[in-house]
Amino acid sequence: LGPGGDPLPAAFFGRPADRVARDLLGADLVVRGRDGGIRRLSLVEVEAYLGAHDLACHGRTGPTKRNATMFGPAGVWYVYLCYGIHWMLNIVTGDVGQPAAVLVRGVAEIVGPGRVTKGLEIDGGFDGRPATPETGLWIAKPAGGVRWPLPARWIERTPRIGVDYAGLWAAKPLRFVVDAGRLPRMDRAGVDPFGLARPTQPVRRR
């Protein structure tokens, strides 16, 4: 395998968003930079948005120009601008026509969805692109001997952040977080090929 690792196939994402979200923890978000260098960081915090019945989901009111990508095939990036400032990175899940996705909220060393996209130079240009090495942004199986999917005892489930408007759905435990100290650290230049990485600090709660 190259430094970007073994990409997850589209079929991995063609499942309910909550199942995909849980299994994404510990996998690697991989970005090819403008200089051609590879950055690879473990996913440590995600949120699931289950579809039109989920009152916190962008697709609850039907397709629009902004959310059209959510109604397409699984394994495609859905990237939108929040408050006119921060790009939010999501991966589409489930069946075509059923708007569901997983929001990337944190990777090892970078916590907060806006910080992730800023730190990795991800913007709206990735919206609608498949999560493959050919597009320069993908998710790979973890390197460094990480046990994956992660054991349930490593994962905390909580309500999602910033969805108080969603009624009963605001309390659903659809945010998934893992202690980043259990995962190998990927340095800023790329992957640690020998699995000798130092542990990160635990994920900060907000």
Write out the residue ranges for each language-model feature.
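Conserved, well-structured core segments that form or line functional sites
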Residues: L1-R206
